[in-house]
Structures are given as structure tokens and as C-alpha cells.
Curated annotation (Swiss-Prot):
There is a cross-link at residues 119, 126, 132 (Glycyl lysine isopeptide (Lys-Gly) (interchain with G-Cter in SUMO2)). The gene is C1D. Belongs to the C1D family. The lineage of its organism: Eukaryota, Metazoa, Chordata, Craniata, Vertebrata. Induction: By gamma-radiation. The keyword Phosphoprotein applies. This is Nuclear nucleic acid-binding protein C1D.
Amino acid sequence: MAGEEINEDYPVEIHEYLSAFENSIGAVDEMLKTMMSVSRNELLQKLDPLEQAKVDLVSAYTLNSMFWVYLATQGVNPKEHPVKQELERIRVYMNRVKEITDKKKAGKLDRGAASRFVKNALWEPKSKNASKVANKGKSKS
């Protein structure tokens, strides 16, 4: 669109924005073609349940976001449309999945290893009796 002649149907000031919008739509179209090239069942069979939930949530969020953009292009305020509540609901579930993922990644305490580490890391001074016995043993040799 950069080499094309500017259409007089809209103000020149928004030409860059329209070009960027058109490029973004093209990128979304390519991404969706890639996602749609594999059947949903085929894709989900390869994933564990948490990954399946992520795919479902991203798909739902993408679809609703695209509807948001559609409403905006039609002159409808999407902030006053039920799609806003749907996007918020999906965002809440995405946060729940993120919390679960973070808990799985969090370090777990190995009590045995921690106990050995602390026991060996703490320095204990030898008692006076033990050092006298050690000195007597050295002098007799």
C-alpha cells in the first residue's frame, strides 16, 4: 500500500494508520491460517491438560478480540458491548492458568537435602576437652 496512490475518500492524516491496520490484519490472517491448518483434536491430543486450557483460552480471547475490532470498525463502542465482559472473563481464567503454571515452576523444598546442607554449613567450635585430647595425641607421636 506504500507505493499505491492515496485514495481521496479519507483524510490523508490517517493513511499511515490504515496501512498499519491493513498489515496487522494480514498478519492475523496468516496466523489464523497456520492455526487452522491442524485440526483441533489433532492439536489437543499432543498437549497436556494445562496446555490444552491455554490453547482454548488463547483461541477464545483471539476470537473475542477480533469481534471487538469488528465492532469498532462498525462504529459500535465495544466498551459498552457484552464482548467486554467476555474478554474480562477470559482474562480471569488466563490469570488462573498462569497461577497454576507458576506454582508448578516454583521450587520445591527437599527437606533431606536442606537438612544436610544446614547441618554441614553450620560451624561448631570444638570443645576445649576435645582440643586438649587432640594435642596430647600429637605430642606422644
